[in-house]
A protein has these predicted regions:
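Short amphipathic alpha-helical segments with coiled-coil-like heptad repeat character
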Residues: 1-4, 83-87, 175
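Secretory targeting and sorting signals
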Residues: 1-31
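Residue-level marker of positions within ordered structural domains that often coincide
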Residues: 24, 82, 172
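Generic hydrophobic, helix-prone segments enriched in Leu/Val/Ile
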Residues: 44-47, 81, 85, 156
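Secreted/periplasmic proteins that engage bacterial cell-wall peptidoglycan
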Residues: 57-130, 134-135
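Domain-level detector of nuclease and nuclease-like folds
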Residues: 112-181
Length: 181
């Protein structure tokens, strides 16, 4: 069941990010109808007539353009990193007097590797479990996020549908690749 929930989170995240970026830049990418797009033309024929372009360059990309890392965008008193750890870990133990916000330890069933990983907050141990942007921020930048407002980019960077707690090594290997990496 947990694996199903993680996969649904990934799929929902991809859909949400696609909609946000697509709707935000859609008007800039609108194509004027050509003479060969008649009422009787099929969707396939219309799509076949469109020019396919590659992604934009990373020119100007900086992580800071997506706002403060792990902001409390939902204003629940808990930063996004701890929100995701609370959602994705089991057997969670919290730091005292943090209103069940700051995760001290827990268990992760990694959706990427299938491994079970013990999480313990600490300077040398927290990297075992990292939070992955399923659609990496630099990838989103190249696919239209550079046209979003600062507020929308911060929301995108902290969108729980685009975030998963994962094994640190798997996250490092994926790096800023796209969701298919």
């Amino acid at each position: 069941m947990r694996r199903h929930n993680s996969m649904m989170s990934v799929l929902s995240g991809l859909l949400a990010v696609g909609l946000v970026v697509g709707l935000s830049v859609g008007s800039a990418l609108a194509v004027e109808p050509t003479d060969n797009t008649g009422a009787g033309q099929s969707a396939t024929q219309a799509l076949d007539s469109l020019e396919v372009k590659g992604r934009a360059p990373k020119t100007g990309y900086k992580r800071t353009q997506f706002g403060k890392a792990w902001a409390d965008v939902d204003r629940n008193g808990c930063d996004t990193r701890n929100d995701i750890l609370n959602r994705d870990l089991t057997d969670v133990k919290h730091k005292v007097r943090t209103h069940d916000c700051v995760v001290e330890s827990g268990q992760l069933h990694d959706p990427y590797t299938g491994k079970d990983i013990a999480f313990k907050k600490g300077w040398k141990t927290s990297t075992a479990v990292q939070i992955d942007h399923v659609v990496a921020l630099s990838d989103a930048w190249q696919k239209g996020a550079q046209k979003l407002s600062q507020t929308k980019r911060t929301e995108l960077a902290n969108d729980p549908y685009n975030l998963l707690a994962v094994q640190g090594k798997a996250n490092q290997k994926k790096s800023d690749g796209d969701a298919a990496t």
